[in-house]
Amino acid sequence: MIASDGLGIAGVDEVGRGCLFGPVFAAAVVLSDHAAEHLQAAGLTDSKALTPSRRAALVPLIEAHAHAWGLGQSSARAVDRDGIRSATEQAMLCALQRLPCRPQLVLVDGVLPLRLWEGSQRTIVRGDSSHAAIAAASVLAKEARDALIRRLSNRFPGYGLERHAGYGTAQHRAALLACGPTPLHRHSFLRKLFATV
């Protein structure tokens, strides 16, 4: 029996799945029904629909009002070694394992279930737009990954990472052709884009 106040349910989402650079991040969030209403009234929705400043402002609210939350990540090397789906699932599993209590139900954004999760789960297409716990997870994962990429942009200048966060923009592709990949690029992704890399 799942708690009627929402506390037995965790929303989980990932960010950075399609990036050419850096890790894939995931977050898991447990919200009470009251916290979900409060956060939605404060503007919580899918992280992709929020401005960077609005997203950043929501992070301390989510952290303060969530019953529990956890972050996980899988490196570019794990993506290359295990494939993006497995690496994403590992990040999600890590985020779930960082929760203080095992959720009775996991709501997963998207269509693919977590093969590594042995408990109850439900996939929800566009769940980050319709379920507050998934939306909160998307915001925490996005902000955590973006903060890491900004720090890494100082270590790897010339790629414009601080502007595109590792996604395959024209600027990023041009920098890859000019400078070659860094150790934190996903080489398995680059082979699909550039036969010469």
Swiss-Prot record:
This is Ribonuclease HII. HAMAP family: RNase_HII_B. A divalent metal cation binds at D13, E14, D109. Belongs to the RNase HII family. One of its GO terms (biological process) is mismatch repair. One of its GO terms (cellular component) is cytoplasm. Manganese or magnesium. Binds 1 divalent metal ion per monomer in the absence of substrate. May bind a second metal ion after substrate binding. It comes from Synechococcus sp. (strain CC9311). It is an enzyme of class 3 (hydrolase). Coiled coil: none annotated. The gene is rnhB. Endonuclease that specifically degrades the RNA of RNA-DNA hybrids. The keyword Transit peptide does not apply. Gene3D superfamilies: Ribonuclease H-like superfamily/Ribonuclease H. Pfam families: RNase_HII. Its cofactor is Mn(2+); Mg(2+). GO terms for molecular function: manganese ion binding; RNA binding; RNA-DNA hybrid ribonuclease activity.
